């Protein structure tokens, strides 16, 4: 089966739907934000959540954290996420390190994690019930 085979996507959606229902991850009407970096794993998560939103009975949005650690590359990731969310019609909240009271992402992984958690807390306080994250097998 090729990665772009539509049956692969349907199979993946079916597995995710079954897992979400079995685990009781979402309640009717909940607002779910996909945490998206712009990478393949998180963008796939966003697309799958959008495809399943009706069956899961959830409202889907996205959030993105710009850690500002990689200069122009971080800004390019943010621009990509903004563009994709606009194209898909997905509400997006962007958190940027050192802005709007958010911490800087210094201090390596611990600092980056602290920034992500601060962003997720802000998103949750804004009315989002669940934040979904995606990781590849090698993460």
Predicted regions and their residues:
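Core alpha/beta nucleotide-donor-binding catalytic domains of modification enzymes
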Residues: 1-139
